[in-house]
Amino acid sequence: MDMLSAAEQRTLEQRMQKRQVKEFMGAFGGLVEHCFMSCVDDFTSKAISNRESGCINRCVQKWMASQQRISDRFQEHNAQLTAQMNK
């Protein structure tokens, strides 16, 4: 990134930010769809039942925990790669 001009760096950073937003929105949309399809099955009322609400909360918590675990493993892997490259 040091070889890029200031304008090129800004362009690259903007593209990276747009990509991150797009990836986040895709993941969020997938989460919403998965939890909705798994938990909401009664369409006779506008309100979400207590059972559905609890299911959605558990679904989101599991997803957040899995994303944290993936992030932790990714950071560990990157640290190992960095250590190997610095040898």
From Swiss-Prot:
Its main location: mitochondrion. Keywords: Chaperone, Disulfide bond, Membrane, Metal-binding, Mitochondrion, Mitochondrion inner membrane, Protein transport, Translocation, Transport, Zinc. Gene3D superfamilies: Mitochondrial import inner membrane translocase subunit tim13 like domains. One of its GO terms (biological process) is protein transport. It is a peripheral membrane protein. A motif (Twin CX3C motif) lies at residues 35-59. It comes from the Eukaryota. Disulfide bonds join 35-59, 39-55. Mitochondrial intermembrane chaperone that participates in the import and insertion of multi-pass transmembrane proteins into the mitochondrial inner membrane. Also required for the transfer of beta-barrel precursors from the TOM complex to the sorting and assembly machinery (SAM complex) of the outer membrane. Acts as a chaperone-like protein that protects the hydrophobic precursors from aggregation and guide them through the mitochondrial intermembrane space. The twin CX3C motif contains 4 conserved Cys residues that form 2 disulfide bonds in the mitochondrial intermembrane space. However, during the transit of TIM9 from cytoplasm into mitochondrion, the Cys residues probably coordinate zinc, thereby preventing folding and allowing its transfer across mitochondrial outer membrane. This is Mitochondrial import inner membrane translocase subunit TIM9. The lineage of its organism: Eukaryota, Fungi, Dikarya, Ascomycota, Pezizomycotina.
